[in-house]
Amino acid sequence: MAKIPVLEIFGPTIQGEGRVIGRKTMFVRTAGCDYRCSWCDSSFTWDGSMKDEIQMMTAEEIYDRLYEIGGDCFNHVTISGGNPALIKGIQDLVDLFEEKNIESALETQGSRFQPWMRQINDLTISPKPPSSGMKPNIQILDEVIEQCVKETLNLKVVVFDDDDYEFAKYIHHRYPDLPFYLQVGNPYLDDEVENHTARLLERYENLVDKVMQTNDMNQVYVLPQLHTLLWSNMKGV
């Protein structure tokens, strides 16, 4: 059985982003990413700062750890990163979740497709906007989206500034039939941030106001990062 590089397993908690925001879930955070986003809130998955914490685990070992800390208080697991779509071996984990009647969620930037992504119940593709410093390959994004199951797929773009908002409009209009979520960016990544919740809510209100004043984003959902409103930048929640 293939082994998966794991940095964190935690929960139960709530999903803080996207279509399943508020959903009770467990988290499995994998190591490794093919992007280097300037504002990444989980850069420890790829910058080497926690390389000594990586555990190579089989699907069975991951499930056993989930059950050890979550007991029977969950039936949904979010696979996070980094970019889990780099890891072919997650196939074993997704198969095991299906066997155990556990629903799964995944977020990826859409730079890589894996066949097991077709088995994910809540699949979020989140192309990275200009503020990230990354430039998505739109042709590859088209190919990845084409191979996914449309009924389980949604798109999300994080917005920090006007350029990001224009990018979000471009993505939404390129794939108009897919559910689309705008998420306000969190530029305050220190462990302790004064008035963090109030500052994030102000940014969220500004994004909401922007969407309300245009007629070409009538079908979008505008969301905050719910977990940052509750717990700021705390890890493991």
Language-model features: locations:
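Flexible, acidic/Gly-rich N-terminal and inter-domain linker regions that tether
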Residues: 1-31, 35-43, 214-215, 221
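Conserved Radical SAM active-site core
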Residues: 7-8, 24, 36-121
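Short, mixed-charge, low-aromatic patches
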Residues: 17-23, 48, 121-125, 159
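Conserved residues at beta->alpha junctions
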Residues: 31, 81, 159
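A short, flexible beta-alpha/helix-coil linker loop
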Residues: 12, 45-47, 187-189
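Conserved beta-strand segments that form the floor/walls of ligand-binding pockets within enzyme
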Residues: 5, 27-29, 41, 78, ...
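Short linear functional motifs in flexible/disordered or boundary regions
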Residues: 18, 40, 49-52, 167, ...
